[in-house]
Amino acid sequence: MTEEPEFSLGVEEEYLLVDAETGDLREAPDALMEACKAELADQVGPEFLRCQIEIGTPVAADVAQARDHLARLRGSIARHAAEFGLAPISVACHPVADWRAQGRTDKDRYNQISQEMGGVARRMLICGMHVHVGISDKDMRIDLMNQFSWFLPHLLALSASSPFWLGEDTLLASYRTTVFAGYPRTGLPPRLGSWAEFDRSVEMLTETGIIQDASKIWWDLRPSARFPTLETRVCDACPRLDDAITLVALVQATLRMLWRLSRQNLRWRQYDNFLLGENRWRATRYGSTEGLIDFGSRRILPFDEIAESWLAAIAEDADALDSQPAVAGLRDMIARGSAAERQRALFASAITAGATPQEAFRSIVGWLIDEFRRDL
């Protein structure tokens, strides 16, 4: 396990389509999807609901290339959507939309999920971001997965963008996390001893007909079913491109740091999912505003302190990966506050200025439209 992995990157994002004037959800017209497909081929496609669009970047050698891919994809979809009076937004939950009013995409995989999951699937009006990091050695993938779980609550806290649901403040920073928890085989991954153990577990479920393949395992972090990658799935969709890229860079540099430790026969601190799950809940509830538990010191640390410790741990790796500027964006994200905090602040400001709740929510969607286009 000493040969350095590729640490190549791939990013998947899910977007919502809204009316550019009213901010209401709209289904993607067939002509829009055809135009996107004509330009972007298999890098774009429908998602579970017809108001969603999913993108997947080509493999990127580094963070700069991943940013170029994402900027191109976001820009292309925004341009084509505008021709239909629509706009894409990248956010984990629309603040007011009703999942019961959304049409499902007629696709074999989605039809199967709908049949298997019933009402749970119909509520999936949520969007996330998935980050793939290339690690060809299978046992290394499992070893790094075990250690990287520590950082999953950190990523969720930073990405949290879903405070509202059906026009109500949920008091959570990431309501999406609670919606997705309705699916089986979600949450923190179990600690596994080897690739063979993972393979045996998947085989048990496929042989009994529970799942068709490993793509039906929806942990926050998993070995990809399609690629030689570790796939981080915990993040809410990020409204702003550069925030998404900061998270991509943090995932990549942190995995390299863990690999570097393994070369020295060292490991990152390990705690069971009972304790890690408490930090995951804190991230779901508060985002980055109330800190996370440091189990070694038995204290709740504020997120700016967590960030500086994290950046120090991965500094050598960010240098090696040439991702220092993107990683340093962590400080900017904390200073600005999460997308969940900013949506609440916009709502409160609009209400104070005399807006109705409907108008205040519309201002949030307008901000999300602007954020999507920023930094392209």
From Swiss-Prot:
GO molecular-function term, one example from the UniProt record: ATP binding
Pfam families: GCS2
Top EC class for this record: ligase
Keywords, alphabetical: ATP-binding, Ligase, Nucleotide-binding
EC number: 6.3.2.2
Reaction(s) this enzyme catalyzes, per UniProt: L-cysteine + L-glutamate + ATP = gamma-L-glutamyl-L-cysteine + ADP + phosphate + H(+)
GO biological process: modified amino acid biosynthetic process
Claim: ATP-binding is one of the keywords in the record: yes
Cysteine pairings via disulfide bonds: none
InterPro entries with a match to the protein in the record: GCL_type2/YbdK_subfam, GCS2, Gln_synth/guanido_kin_cat_dom, YbdK
Source superkingdom: Bacteria
Protein family: Belongs to the glutamate--cysteine ligase type 2 family. YbdK subfamily.
Functional description taken from the UniProt entry: ATP-dependent carboxylate-amine ligase which exhibits weak glutamate--cysteine ligase activity.
PANTHER family in the cross-refs: GLUTAMATE--CYSTEINE LIGASE 2-RELATED
Record's protein name: Putative glutamate--cysteine ligase 2
